[in-house]
């Protein structure tokens, strides 16, 4: 076996924290007078920054918007972040770790923040389903490959 294959991957969570949080109920108290049948929209975004060698900040942005009759009942935004040490992997494996594995670690914390905020706004309980960040990351890679192929085709023409 080569030395590279013997090198072990190291993954450590240094810290998990809420970076930013926002809750708005722009149509309260009128929204409380209506029968609660909202349309709930979930938006997710991730980003990562290098803080030091093998040390990364990963930010998971979760936005939940509940609308009723085309009016916003509530808008909840959470930026859940973590500082992670990742050693022994590079390239696509590192991108997968930062773009899928770390968000999987962060999501339960973001979900708990959102549930608490919605409850404090006195809205009915909101249960966010688990998210498959691995599948989202694979979709992202496929889109990048398609864009790269389209861009290389344009350049050759």
UniProtKB/Swiss-Prot annotation:
Pfam families: SecB (PF02556)
Entry's family note: Belongs to the SecB family.
Lipid biosynthesis recorded as keyword: no
Species for this entry: Proteus mirabilis (strain HI4320)
GO biological process per UniProt: protein folding; protein tetramerization; protein transport
Entry's Gene Ontology cellular component terms: cytoplasm
SUPFAM superfamilies: SecB-like
UniProt function note: One of the proteins required for the normal export of preproteins out of the cell cytoplasm. It is a molecular chaperone that binds to a subset of precursor proteins, maintaining them in a translocation-competent state. It also specifically binds to its receptor SecA.
Subunit: Homotetramer, a dimer of dimers. One homotetramer interacts with 1 SecA dimer.
Protein name from the UniProt record: Protein-export protein SecB
Source taxon at top rank: Bacteria
Compartment(s) of residence: Cytoplasm
């Amino acid at each position: 076996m080569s030395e590279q294959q013997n090198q072990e991957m190291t993954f450590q969570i240094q810290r998990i924290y809420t970076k930013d949080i926002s809750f708005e109920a722009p149509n309260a108290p009128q929204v409380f007078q209506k029968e609660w049948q909202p349309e709930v929209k979930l938006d997710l975004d991730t980003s990562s920054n290098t803080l030091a060698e093998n040390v990364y900040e990963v930010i998971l942005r979760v936005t939940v918007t509940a609308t009723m009759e085309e009016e916003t009942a509530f808008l909840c935004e959470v930026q859940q972040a973590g500082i992670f040490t990742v050693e022994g992997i590079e390239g696509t494996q590192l991108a997968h770790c930062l773009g899928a594995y770390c968000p999987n670690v962060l999501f339960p914390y973001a979900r708990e923040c959102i549930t608490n905020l919605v409850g404090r706004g006195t809205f009915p309980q909101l249960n966010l389903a688990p998210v498959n960040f691995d599948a989202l990351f694979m979709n992202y890679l496929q889109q990048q490959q398609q864009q790269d192929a389209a861009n290389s085709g344009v350049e050759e023409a």
